[in-house]
Amino acid sequence: MPAWVVPSALELDDLYSVARSEYDAPRGNRPQACGIVGALMWVTGDARVGPVTGRPEQPVTAAVATAECWAARAMGHSSETPEWQLKAACTELGVAYWPPNVELIDPEEGYGVYQTLSWLLRWLDGYRGGSVPPLPLPQRHLDGSTVTADELGVGADQPASSAPSRAASAIA
């Protein structure tokens, strides 16, 4: 795992599993989940090219990931992120400019990449300030074990999605 990745390896495994489940679900958001999985595979070296630009740099550095995040963000906000701004960001980061490749990935997949890289980098200018994973992750105890529905007080008549968030659990 690259040293610049802020979330733990366990959180990355959880996100990968949740995204794969979302992709396989009949009504899941497949493009977003595909973008999430693509970003995780690229960052860990399991995919050789950037998911949005096709940039071939490996290993992925924080600067390269930030440039890819800019490109992913531009896919969903093309009118708000002109090409000159992407080029300027790459220059500031000291990496080569690679434009978003609309034939490589669709905008919803690009948004999943943007969300994921923002979170991995804890990029303040990114999706939700880089502090929120792109999909809800399972809650865990300090020892890493998963919190059960019984421990959350989720009954058969109460959906698991109404369970308190990690942040709420940490405050309590």
Task: Locate the predicted segments by residue.
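Compositionally biased accessory segments in Actinobacterial proteins
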Residues: 1-172
